Amino acid sequence: MMAKVSKRMKEISAKINAEKKYPVSEAFDLLREVSSVKFVESVDVSVALGVDPRKSDQVVRGASVLPNGTGKTVRVAVFAKGPAADAAKEAGAEVVGMEDLADEVKKGNMDFDVVIASPDSMRVVGQLGQILGPKGLMPNPKIGTVTMDVAKAVRDAKAGQVRYRVDKAGIIHTTIGKVNFTSDALKQNLEQLLTDLKKAKPAVSKGIYLKKVSVSSTMGPGINVDFSDLNI
């Protein structure tokens, strides 16, 4: 098994020049070329930003609605009541509730990928921080998951919204689709993400902001992308 893996890695290394910045479409073609697993891999992106994440005013976080989605089915839970709860259900939320939903979360019943909350439900949701927080599910107004318009938030989540937060090294990691997407679809998704990241640039960030962009498949190596010709 190890021999097979190392042989595959040698073949991949021969095809990808780690020092080169590849045109976007060529990078996506390469991803498909080196993908040899039996499932449809996600296309992940890492963006190195010119920020110091140790400083609170340089923590970049937010959300981006990708025009071509992520290729994933997203299950949404919403904390809301009254008309807001009805609107969330109509928008396609799988689970909607208040104290009853909180009880399910406390029991560990969390068959959902995104949690959205109306502002008046935060008294209930606030008690679940230690459960939802470590799983990256805690609603937050900065990424649009605490909102008066829960229906729009549900639709955005279903349409392929990705959330991001800069890590300690100043890098954003997220997904922009699947390897079976067309190169144009992946390019449009990447352009949307980078456009939204530029809008989220902290005022105190100096010098080059978008420093490096690389793409990879789930099991594949990173490929550096020349993003200078993108529409961002």
UniProtKB/Swiss-Prot annotation:
Keywords: Repressor, Ribonucleoprotein, Ribosomal protein, RNA-binding, rRNA-binding, Translation regulation, tRNA-binding
SUPFAM superfamilies, A to Z: Ribosomal protein L1 (SSF56808)
GO aspect biological process, one term: translation
A GO molecular function held by the record: structural constituent of ribosome
One family name in Pfam for this protein: Ribosomal_L1
Classification via InterPro entries: Ribosom_uL1_bac-type, Ribosomal_uL1, Ribosomal_uL1-like, Ribosomal_uL1/biogenesis, Ribosomal_uL1_3-a/b-sand, Ribosomal_uL1_CS
GO cellular component assignments: cytosolic large ribosomal subunit
Assembly and interaction partners: Part of the 50S ribosomal subunit.
Family the UniProt entry places it in: Belongs to the universal ribosomal protein uL1 family.
Protein's job: Binds directly to 23S rRNA. The L1 stalk is quite mobile in the ribosome, and is involved in E site tRNA release. Protein L1 is also a translational repressor protein, it controls the translation of the L11 operon by binding to its mRNA.
Name of this protein: Large ribosomal subunit protein uL1
Organism: Francisella tularensis subsp. holarctica (strain LVS)
Lineage: Bacteria, Pseudomonadati, Pseudomonadota, Gammaproteobacteria, Thiotrichales
